[in-house]
């Protein structure tokens, strides 16, 4: 039975038991910022188990893609060396949210595993564990299912504390928890190992295939377990493990899914397809890398991106070890798509993107991999003992891009370990240097503590009345602000938009009789809106009623830029690919800035395509529509949500151009797309590894920008005595004439240098039988001096030469030694000494060297080194 067939059978079985099939969630957890990657089937249902979210179903089944690499759950260092460790795996799971409990969960599991309609596993091969005091589960297994007592094992608190057990699950020190029951498969007496709970349980004979967790208690801080009103079930069965059982193999790498990837890896590398751990590493890592990139992660030096980079570089190193020539890793993506693309369509849709990202990362790492490996070999050759020092590990990380675990991998192959504590000390020292070099600012919002919330009126109006419910000065609550004092005003209701979602806060003023407070910015803490500004006149007190007026012109310009940002986001996905995700934005009245995930610079023709798409939507002049709904309905309509953003029960969906752009957004926007008038991109560049930034302008600012550009074109045309139509031809002619003149100048300089060479040769002095010449030729560039040194070497025959020049405000130096003397005197050594005198650097071959510096006043002193240099060396 193939892996794909097992996956589908599992999903179909539970659908027949009334479960709703739920698609795998992203590897980037959308509802848990504490989690690096999705690592279990229950992650996407966490809020359901906690009672914080209600769904249309109470029974669910899924095949969840999971990654365990980095953070608490890190299998990276074991991958390739064991039969069952992976960075990526699939978790089959069925779930009950206050619906069925132990009896049904146990019966479902047993029927799926043993029924001849489904997996038809021999019952006598299955062992079961339960928590020691869970008599209910034990009785269901023995009395209702019929598992004999000799294949039942009670597991107590085997981890040194109450409820610390392999068979008791907890979400944390407090909160939902409960016993679990695990099903094991016995591979037979030919494999070493003992049953669960025995001293030999770590062997490979008895393998856990399914875990059923019964969330039945809530543990309080005092350690007491209180029964939950609606117990739930969370189960998990690794697809790779059950596939190994069904295909009668003992290693996950022997199942059909991995066999195709191993073959593809061997072909891409150009090695034999055997049992080498390095080949298993590559086959495993293509899965995690492919799926992470498909879900929007790009290689970088922090967070999820750094974990991805570590996995890619580990795969590259193991490919290099197997003899890979050039980049190979990206070539395996096609096999991954063939194997898993049907179950996970995002792989098919992102194949070209995944290949490009991997190829780019491979090529970048290849530049330092060989050099780093040589350095490591040198350090290991000098190593005394069995531990690689932390400073060596850090040097490889900091200089050559070797993640710590990659160096650890290499050390492990030599039966060495690495000094992780020493590495961390070096890292902390680097962080401290960075902190010392940083400027620190204070988060003023964090000083303001307001319990009440502000009602926002700004979607419908730019003015309204509100009551002052709090005033702050220097972060401290006050009863009054007087003329000239800066502070923060909190109202019970306001038309001012508070900074969020990339849109800056509104400005304007608050008026209460003679008192006027000029609002410079608006922010938010909790549910309270903070109006930051200064008292322009009078005094403002707590309890006063104010007329709040937003600067409507500034807000309108900001709203146009915000709407244009949404149109740009969709245009980027159409032009560059669906891998594009928003990484940040800043929208004010002057311009918009949009950061997004992409692996290379946006090409000029792509910039034009982006502008064309956005301006097309602007010309369509469609209504900008908003709708309040729940998050699941919004996602079903295709609304884009930002990863890591926490959304409430009700969300605001913003649509433009019908379904052209549909996003969750709480910002202020144009009424119609035509209000934007014009969209123009003014810059594009990189801000971090895998993150690009576009800046653009709209409306009157865009028109002014184009008018200024038109004026520059006219001025340029006048300078070359042309017009708009023939400007390019005129400029091309000027540049060609300039190239010809530069060529003529070089020829004249060469002739002048040649003539000077005849005169200079007469200025050489004799030192111990050799001619030594040092001369200053201001105005000559390095190219001319090189040619002259060559000429003088031929003319003098047995010589040491040092020429210098002041050229464009800097010192240029060239040294030469005839080959018959280069065994005794090195031109590079002379250059290092001379360049140091003029505050620069230099070097080169024994017979020819170049250098320079910035201290023109010391040039003569540098040239004077030639004679003593020759005297000492001859």
From Swiss-Prot:
Xref: SUPFAM superfamilies: Class II aaRS and biotin synthetases, Putative anticodon-binding domain of alanyl-tRNA synthetase (AlaRS), ThrRS/AlaRS common domain, Translation proteins
Keywords from the UniProt entry: Aminoacyl-tRNA synthetase, ATP-binding, Cytoplasm, Ligase, Metal-binding, Nucleotide-binding, Protein biosynthesis, RNA-binding, tRNA-binding, Zinc
Protein name (Swiss-Prot/TrEMBL): Alanine--tRNA ligase
Subcellular compartments: Cytoplasm
Cofactors, names only: Zn(2+)
Domain of life where this protein originates: Bacteria
Pfam families reported in the protein's UniProt record: DHHA1, tRNA-synt_2c, tRNA_SAD
UniProt family annotation: Belongs to the class-II aminoacyl-tRNA synthetase family.
Function: Catalyzes the attachment of alanine to tRNA(Ala) in a two-step reaction: alanine is first activated by ATP to form Ala-AMP and then transferred to the acceptor end of tRNA(Ala). Also edits incorrectly charged Ser-tRNA(Ala) and Gly-tRNA(Ala) via its editing domain.
InterPro entries linked to this entry: aa-tRNA-synth_II/BPL/LPL (IPR045864), Ala-tRNA-lgiase_IIc (IPR002318), Ala-tRNA-ligase_IIc_anticod-bd (IPR018162), Ala-tRNA-synth_IIc_core (IPR018165), Ala-tRNA-synth_IIc_N (IPR018164), Ala-tRNA_ligase (IPR050058), Ala_tRNA_ligase_euk/bac (IPR023033), DHHA1_dom (IPR003156)
SMART domains on file: tRNA_SAD
